[in-house]
Amino acid sequence: MSESENNTTPAVAARDDRLVWVDLEMTGLDLKRHVIVEVAALVTDANLNVLGEGVDLVVHATEEELAQMDDFVTNMHESSGLTEQIRESAVTLKEAEDAVLALIEKHCDPAHPAPLAGNSIATDRAFIREQMPRLDEALHYRMVDVSSVKELARRWYPRVYYKQPEKGLAHRALADIVESIRELDYYRRSFFVAEPGPTSEQCADDAQAAVDRFAPYFD
């Protein structure tokens, strides 16, 4: 029996509900000195089903650009094998950006730009905005940051936080994306209201309770 038949996973959601998951590896965190050296992207529907093969590209960097890495980043990229692949790669950043844009065009509705999704993605978005502006324009200004859910789980449901799936810490872009999708899937199962969700009446009651609680701040 398929997942859709036993109702554990809803059917693939509409094109205007997609999420674009992007993870970057850089030579550091300074937008002016450091460059993107690995780009990975996957598209999921609203139910976190991965659509298609995605993008997984190592971007060439010059020796001068690699020399900007500090000791921590140097050791991280060397131990993962990324540094050698950067030197061997002939892929330009524009080509990597083109590949992600093609992925978005294939799976997403251009009339409804998809949010960027990932883990602690503010830095990734900053590098996208600075070094891949066409990709930035193709994404919705809103973002889905799994680390925000993580922080709420830590405060509200510590057991959920401490039982989250362990990460491999590969420090490679595609592996990081898959781990982020898996983590959000875990939170959806353990943290959020089970399907089919609350009734309209329950939502109305909860909304009124929230309004009542914070009403004094609006007096």
From Swiss-Prot:
The record's section on InterPro entries has:
Exonuclease_RNaseT/DNA_pol3, Oligoribonuclease, RNaseH-like_sf, RNaseH_sf
Report domain Exonuclease positions: 19-184
Q: Which UniProt keywords apply?
A: Cytoplasm, Exonuclease, Hydrolase, Nuclease
Q: Which GO terms describe its cellular component?
A: cytoplasm
Enzyme class, one word? hydrolase
Q: Does the keyword Ribosomal protein apply?
A: no
Question: What GO MF annotations does this protein's record show?
Answer: 3'-5'-RNA exonuclease activity; nucleic acid binding
Q: Which residues form the active site?
A: Y141
Q: What is its main location?
A: cytoplasm
Localization, per the record, is:
Cytoplasm
E.C. number, please? 3.1.15.-
Signal sequence span per UniProt? none
Q: Does the keyword Nuclease apply?
A: yes
Instruction: Give me the segments passing through the membrane.
Output: none
Q: Which residues form a coiled coil?
A: none
Q: Which family does it belong to?
A: Belongs to the oligoribonuclease family.
Q: What does this protein do?
A: 3'-to-5' exoribonuclease specific for small oligoribonucleotides.
* Entry-linked HAMAP family: Oligoribonuclease
Q: What PANTHER family does the entry give?
A: OLIGORIBONUCLEASE, MITOCHONDRIAL
Task: Output this protein's name.
Answer: Oligoribonuclease
Q: What organism does this protein naturally occur in?
A: Corynebacterium glutamicum (strain R)
Q: From the UniProt record, report the name of the gene that encodes this protein.
A: orn
